[in-house]
């Protein structure tokens, strides 16, 4: 018991040297420690606990070998004076409001991640993407797109935006339509075929019939009678259509049967009757 007690006294002696230096003539350690303890006890406020709780005869041995109180309690009332020191517990911006504002974004991100993907479906145990529905164009939209495609097969961004706004379509739909039409025409020309009559402007656009019809290769109007010219005008339609070839073929057959044959080479070098030299 004497060993821990002497170590305790040595620690207290070291603390007292900061305010009162120890002289060489100090007889023993217990007298110095007793004086120091009286000094500290006298300067602290009366009626309060000591700055150090001295439990000298019931210590707990620490891992370092010297005794210390199990739960040291400090009293700062003597240092401050009669006023008591109270820490400020309430703050202007607490932690709970911050947590409250941070919780909704976290819940939102989790809910977005948990949404199932509607474009992927399991078919026979394998994921398969659902194909988007095909865009259905009206006859007016097809006619306007076809007219614009005949003018230019490639559209600039402002032109594409303007055309999409006029037809009530998106720019992506107009872009895809032009891409499909270009690839289709390239495939037809590669195979040696012309554009089919189904998608020609004569069938897809009713306003394209206002264009003048192409004249025949040779003109034999000078040798025909007025009755024959009237029959030709009646047989030729006002707009170019698939029936135009049939009417022209029937008219040409009637001309051959009447016995009036003209060589194309002679007619082509023949000047028209109204030419003035």
Curated annotation (Swiss-Prot):
<dbReference type="InterPro" id="IPR017970">
    <property type="entry name" value="Homeobox_CS"/>
</dbReference>
<dbReference type="InterPro" id="IPR000047">
    <property type="entry name" value="HTH_motif"/>
</dbReference>
<dbReference type="GO" id="GO:0030855">
    <property type="term" value="P:epithelial cell differentiation"/>
</dbReference>
<keyword id="KW-0371">Homeobox</keyword>
<feature type="region of interest" description="Disordered">
    <location>
        <begin position="1"/>
        <end position="33"/>
    </location>
</feature>
<dbReference type="InterPro" id="IPR020479">
    <property type="entry name" value="HD_metazoa"/>
</dbReference>
<feature type="compositionally biased region" description="Polar residues">
    <location>
        <begin position="200"/>
        <end position="212"/>
    </location>
</feature>
<feature type="region of interest" description="Disordered">
    <location>
        <begin position="191"/>
        <end position="277"/>
    </location>
</feature>
<comment type="function">
    <text>May have a regulatory function in the initial formation of the epidermis.</text>
</comment>
<protein>
    <recommendedName>
        <fullName>Homeobox protein DLL-2</fullName>
    </recommendedName>
</protein>
<dbReference type="GO" id="GO:0006357">
    <property type="term" value="P:regulation of transcription by RNA polymerase II"/>
</dbReference>
<comment type="similarity">
    <text>Belongs to the distal-less homeobox family.</text>
</comment>
<feature type="DNA-binding region" description="Homeobox">
    <location>
        <begin position="130"/>
        <end position="189"/>
    </location>
</feature>
<keyword id="KW-0539">Nucleus</keyword>
<dbReference type="GO" id="GO:0000978">
    <property type="term" value="F:RNA polymerase II cis-regulatory region sequence-specific DNA binding"/>
</dbReference>
<dbReference type="InterPro" id="IPR050460">
    <property type="entry name" value="Distal-less_Homeobox_TF"/>
</dbReference>
<dbReference type="GO" id="GO:0000981">
    <property type="term" value="F:DNA-binding transcription factor activity, RNA polymerase II-specific"/>
</dbReference>
<keyword id="KW-0217">Developmental protein</keyword>
<keyword id="KW-0238">DNA-binding</keyword>
<dbReference type="GO" id="GO:0005634">
    <property type="term" value="C:nucleus"/>
</dbReference>
<feature type="compositionally biased region" description="Polar residues">
    <location>
        <begin position="14"/>
        <end position="33"/>
    </location>
</feature>
<dbReference type="InterPro" id="IPR009057">
    <property type="entry name" value="Homeodomain-like_sf"/>
</dbReference>
<feature type="compositionally biased region" description="Polar residues">
    <location>
        <begin position="250"/>
        <end position="263"/>
    </location>
</feature>
<dbReference type="InterPro" id="IPR022135">
    <property type="entry name" value="Distal-less_N"/>
</dbReference>
<dbReference type="Pfam" id="PF00046">
    <property type="entry name" value="Homeodomain"/>
</dbReference>
<feature type="compositionally biased region" description="Low complexity">
    <location>
        <begin position="226"/>
        <end position="243"/>
    </location>
</feature>
<dbReference type="Pfam" id="PF12413">
    <property type="entry name" value="DLL_N"/>
</dbReference>
<dbReference type="InterPro" id="IPR001356">
    <property type="entry name" value="HD"/>
</dbReference>
<dbReference type="GO" id="GO:0048706">
    <property type="term" value="P:embryonic skeletal system development"/>
</dbReference>
